[in-house]
């Protein structure tokens, strides 16, 4: 019951349920672990660590518990501990590590070798960590990237990939080592001092960028500044309630002078445009966007013609960052680990600005800060 309430966002009720369960059964491992996760989600890190420690005393080898502790350490910027604990994710029931006859790469010399790099988790994770292919290629490796089929087109423009294989295709047999893209960061002992933050590492075809310059000028009225907006991420993500926000939250953006708001939202969430009451219209792009050229291809080209992108924590945020486009990410009270804590920037993407929620569930004030920030950035130089 506590977990069900957590997924519904009924935080205090969930905590009470866990407390009741522990009162009845003081050695209830799942209650300790899930109570810790509840507090981790809501930013009460000290409480989360307390309940995780209680759970650890009962089951010191629990994989999910170690994974969760890894996430907290990464969020806090303690990458040395974080990567080690996060390795336990492969032992969790919701993760499956591919099995190959070739050895896993754990730091062996790659000069003249071929390494298979495979995606794990979501599209945003792949866009985020595919940067490491270039580093391994520079180290002498031939890199094969096995990625989600929907990313195959856009990753054709990614530096450092020798060969790209969609995950709907059979993996080639001829490689020397394998490693997940995310585990490369672990093997390389990436921390805050050596994050490879050079962008862009994904590039759009120049002809497609030129095409969309012409198209936007035909489809949209003239505008001094164009801002692309995204508000809804994957509704099936377990943390979606803390990441996505209603479109109406973005009304403060209408107070920015001489801006045009362009929706980059497709599928779930786009229906909210019908009930938009902001003082500036939201312009929508053609429904067949990305259909002929491949997922993200048209979108990426369009990003080159926007002054700023304002987005929730979605795969598009990673795409914009990888393209080195000026981007503001609106983050929930406790963000995903890669955004760290208490800073307005990210070492992963130098063209990105982070604005963080200060109260769970309140997005209007975040959007107001975005509007103030963009007003400063877009005002004429004096």
Region roles according to the model:
Residues 1-382:
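Alpha-helical solenoid repeat scaffolds of the TPR/TPR-like class and their adjacent stem/linker regions
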């Amino acid at each position: 019951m506590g977990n069900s309430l957590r997924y519904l966002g009924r935080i205090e009720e969930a905590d009470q349920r866990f407390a009741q369960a522990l009162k009845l059964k003081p050695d209830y491992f799942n209650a300790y672990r899930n109570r810790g996760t509840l507090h981790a989600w809501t930013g009460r890190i000290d409480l989360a660590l307390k309940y995780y420690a209680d759970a650890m005393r009962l089951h010191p080898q629990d994989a999910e518990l170690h994974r969760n502790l890894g996430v907290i350490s990464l969020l806090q910027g303690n990458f040395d501990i974080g990567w080690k604990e996060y390795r336990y994710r492969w032992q969790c029931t919701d993760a499956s590590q591919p099995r190959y006859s070739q050895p896993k790469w754990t730091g062996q010399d790659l000069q003249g070798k071929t390494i298979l790099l495979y995606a794990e988790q979501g599209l945003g994770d792949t866009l985020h960590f595919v940067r490491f292919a270039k580093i391994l290629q520079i180290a002498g490796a031939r890199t094969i990237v096995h990625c989600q089929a929907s990313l195959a087109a856009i990753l054709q423009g990614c530096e450092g990939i020798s060969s790209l294989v969609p995950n709907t295709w059979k993996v080639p047999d001829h490689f020397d080592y394998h490693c997940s893209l995310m585990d490369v960061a672990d093997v390389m002992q990436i921390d805050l001092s050596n994050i490879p933050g050079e962008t862009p590492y994904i590039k759009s075809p120049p002809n497609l960028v030129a095409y969309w310059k012409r198209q936007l000028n035909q489809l949209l009225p003239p505008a001094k500044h164009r801002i692309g907006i995204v508000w809804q991420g994957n509704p099936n993500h377990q943390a979606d309630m803390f990441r996505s926000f209603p479109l109406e939250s973005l009304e403060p953006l209408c107070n920015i002078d001489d801006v045009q708001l362009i929706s980059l939202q497709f599928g779930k969430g786009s229906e909210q445009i019908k009930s938009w009451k902001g003082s500036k219209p939201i312009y929508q792009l053609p429904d067949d966007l990305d259909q002929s050229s491949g997922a993200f291809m048209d979108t990426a080209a369009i990003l080159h013609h926007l002054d700023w992108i304002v987005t929730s924590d979605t795969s598009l945020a990673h795409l914009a960052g990888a393209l080195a486009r000026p981007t503001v990410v609106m983050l929930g009270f406790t963000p995903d680990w890669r955004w760290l804590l208490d800073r307005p920037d990210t070492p992963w993407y130098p063209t990105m600005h982070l604005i963080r929620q200060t109260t769970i569930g309140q997005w209007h004030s975040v959007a107001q800060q975005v509007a103030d920030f963009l007003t400063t950035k877009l005002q004429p130089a004096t």
